C-alpha cells in the first residue's frame, strides 16, 4: 500500500475511496502524450519508494514530461521509477493523519501538517519533510468524522477484502479539496517528521497501545492525546534534497539535546557528524501552536554545524 503507488491508487478506485484522477504508465511516449492531453499543473509520481523525493508537482507540461523521462528513461530512482503514476493536480490544505489499526478497529492519532518543500513559503523541491506541526489547524471535528467514514475505515476494510489485512501504523496523507478530503498517499509506518510532533502529545502509554494493535485488542485500548500543540523543525544540510556536503561536526546546547531526534548523523568517537540531508529534528510542545513553533525555533538556535539549514 506504500511501496506501490499504482497498487494504492487501484485499491482506492476499486473501493470508491476519494483520490485524484490518475493514469499509470511504463513508457515515456505514452505518458508524455497523456500529459499533453491533460495539460498542467499536473503531478508525476514514481511508483515505488524514493525516500520521499519521487513526486514532482509540475507547473508546466515540459516540466512534467522531463520528470517522466528522468524516471522511466534515465532511471533516476532505479526500478522505483520504471512505472509512473500521473495524477490530476489537487488544491487545498494538506493533512497527515497517523493511525493505529489492528485490522478491525482503527484509532486516528492527533492530526499533523508536514511541510515538504525545501524552502520557506512552500517553495523549492519536495523533500522527505522539513518540519511538522500538530494538530493540523485545518482539520476540524467535522472533517475528521468525514475522513473516518469515507477514507479510514473503508481503507482497512478494502485491505481485508483483498486478503491483505493491515495491522500496525497506517499513515493517511490527505488533501482537503473543495469537493472534500481526498487521499494523496498512504504510508505503512510512522511518518517522519510527523511522528516527532504527534507522539509528544500522546498521553497514553505507547507500548500498551502498540501491544493492543498487534494483539487485535485495539477496540478495548485507551488512546488519549493532550490538548496542546507540538512543532518539529528539521535541521538539514544546505543543498538538500539535491547536492550537499556532509561530515561536519555538530554541537548543541544541553536543552536542545534533550529535544533532539537524530537522523542523518553518525558518531566518530565522541563527536557527532552530519551524514545525510535531514540531519536532525528539534521538537517543542506548548499549550498553543504559536508557542510550540517559537519554542522549536528557539531550541534549533542551540544546534550548530557548518551548513545548517532550517
Model-derived regions, located:
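Peripheral (often C-terminal) accessory segments that flank ATP-dependent C-N-forming ligase machineries
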Residues: 212-310
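Internal nucleotide-binding/catalytic subdomain
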Residues: 54-195
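Conserved N-proximal alpha/beta basic substrate-recognition cap immediately N-terminal to
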Residues: 1-38, 42-43
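Solvent-exposed alpha-helix faces
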Residues: 36, 69, 153, 296-298
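A structural signal for short, well-ordered beta-strand elements
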Residues: 24, 57, 285-286
